[in-house]
């Protein structure tokens, strides 16, 4: 009788420990995903630092002087690359749904800015096979 009790107790303890281990794995995976998404957001912020305020206020790219124009154009291209990577990662289930929804809102808003539209048109004409995931998202 006593041996059965300890056997039952050991079984219950094993189940509890298995549950706690599973819960820890779930939490670590969530933490890892959050850190990964945060790194993509930080990458976005670094790119955006090269885009002048005038562009965010709907100015055309050609209103900038040559140096700022070139730096901004390069930053917008890097932004397209980041967005394409984000879309690919979402399709691979490496990004959470709620994060992706927020990113999509931002992507669509940025793609509506004249400077972004201009660079996007140039990219699509010169490299139509690039940025396929981003193309699917923005519809052109």
Task: Tell me the role of every PLM-derived stretch.
Residues 68-140:
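An amphipathic alpha-helical interaction surface
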